[in-house]
Amino acid sequence: MSLFSAKSQAALNLFVHSNLTENNIVSKSEYNPSTGVRTFGYENVDGNWSIGLGGFGSIPLPGKKFSLRLGLNNSYARSVGFVGSERNNADNWTLREELTLAYRFGRLDTSLKGMWSHNKIVNSLGSAANNTATNDYGLHWDTQISLPLNLALESQLRYTSMNGYASGYNYDQTLVNIGLSYSFLKGKVATLRFKVYDLLGEQRNVYRNVSALAISSQETNIIGRYAMLHFIYKFNSFSGNASASDMKNVRRGPGGPPPSGRF
């Protein structure tokens, strides 16, 4: 569902999604202590389902130079499996919230975003020690400054703190990216950009796998500090004298909101 007020320039986009799996095939094992034999097999189970609710909203502040953006993405999922021969229900709660203060005036475009993500797992088997929770915090500061001679300077400063993971996977990191671009040709359709990524060399990529059988934290390899030279060309395939900006105005209307789901 999308709502937009032309008078206040406020926009709201809400979504909901759900999933239900019947007769899901899961593995199961049974151990016979008298013979020492463990038998493996499969069983069809019901009870796997999920639901999610979220949305995005933005509203300009008085003066139109500042704006606030709010993003929500919350979900619940239940997965059913067997630990040995005992059935386990794993309830997975996830909350993701973010708030952005953006400023745009003249040649300056900057935004400060705060983020919080909470994930809690509750298992029907085992003790309360098997019910774990993680909390991730983030602060992003993105800036772009348009300079004379068709130059533009951009930077991204992103701090992340991950807590509640397995030993060795809790960490704080600061990611810094800096770039300089030059636009040329008629209509500035071509851009050369030189950008340095992960200037401090601190980036890590950790993620969590959750199922009815286990919870695991894993880290994948990344490139690390590097630099790239980009060439960007914007194709204009509109007929007549129409331009991409003309088509954007038609799609959005006078002062309309960004496309659905993007703010």
Please annotate each region the language model reported.
Residues 2-263:
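Exposed, low-structure sequence patches enriched in small/polar residues
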